[in-house]
């Protein structure tokens, strides 16, 4: 019997092929959970749910009504919700002065307001049963990365929301934690990682000598969600030791790519 046998696990942000959400969904399903995947691409959600013998519910994580309806639907269909994971994100790369108000609004809606509403609904849903809440954050909530101000700021904000939930709702049996990956090989990072020079520059910042994988994050998530985990309010640094050092500067990445002949000098 898997350690999540009989448990219902909700994973938001599982509609992109082979992203963190999908890899986590497969890992939880392999360990016995009934996994409900959510996102905006219904065809991909349906295919994943069929693959893992799970369920799917459409959700636009920037809309309060959609988030609340998703959680209500899961409980209506499965009579419980034991684990809830948010892996949504938008890797916006824009210099601070060039960040438009529209981009900022979109980032806040997806990466701060959405998680806030999600947590509001979850504490109401889990207050009589307990449960585990996991937010996928980012090492950049604490470690600087050039031209990612809106992304980093909203991720840092959600880390604090998680601590608020953990502090106030622990007596109700609700545990809330976050995971901070560093640079991770996912569809979102596939294009920049085509640069061997860029990849090498990032890997030089990791004491373990490599960037992360979605499987690394899935392993951490199953631990945090398990009954063996006596942790709440924590931000788990799953980034190969990047948190001990720093990300490369934008100028360092540029110089490395120029030296490798991948891009022309300015």
Give the label of every model feature segment:
Residues 95-96, 100-108, 148, 198, ...:
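Substrate-binding pocket helix/loop in short-chain dehydrogenase/reductase
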Residues 124, 167-171:
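Alpha-helical segment proximal to the catalytic Tyr-Lys
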Residues 170, 175, 231-233:
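Short, small/polar-rich loop/turn modules that mediate ligand/substrate recognition or access, typified
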């Amino acid at each position: 019997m898997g350690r999540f046998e009989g448990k219902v696990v909700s994973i938001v942000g599982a509609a992109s092929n082979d992203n963190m959400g999908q890899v986590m969904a497969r890992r939880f399903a392999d360990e016995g959970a009934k996994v409900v995947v959510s996102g905006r691409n219904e065809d991909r959600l349906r295919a994943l749910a069929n693959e893992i013998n799970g369920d799917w519910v459409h959700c636009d994580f920037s809309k309060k009504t959609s988030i609340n309806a998703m959680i209500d639907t899961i409980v209506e269909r499965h009579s419980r919700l034991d684990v809830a994971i948010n892996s949504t994100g938008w890797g916006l790369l824009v210099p601070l002065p060039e960040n438009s108000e529209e981009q900022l609004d979109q980032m806040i809606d997806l990466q701060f307001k959405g998680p806030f509403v999600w947590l509001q609904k979850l504490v109401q849903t889990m207050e009589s049963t307990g449960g585990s809440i996991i937010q996928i954050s980012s090492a950049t909530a604490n470690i600087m990365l050039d031209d990612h101000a809106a992304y980093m700021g909203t991720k840092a904000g959600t880390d604090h929301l998680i601590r608020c939930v953990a502090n106030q709702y622990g007596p109700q049996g609700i545990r809330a934690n976050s995971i901070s990956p560093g640079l991770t090989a996912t569809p979102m990072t596939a294009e920049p990682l085509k640069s061997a020079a860029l990849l090498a520059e990032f890997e030089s910042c990791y004491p373990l000598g490599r960037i992360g994988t979605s499987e690394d994050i899935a392993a951490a998530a199953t631990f945090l969600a398990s009954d063996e985990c006596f942790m709440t309010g924590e931000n788990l640094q799953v980034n190969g030791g990047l948190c001990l050092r720093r990300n490369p500067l934008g100028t360092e990445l540029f110089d490395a790519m120029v030296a490798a002949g991948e891009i022309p000098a300015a």
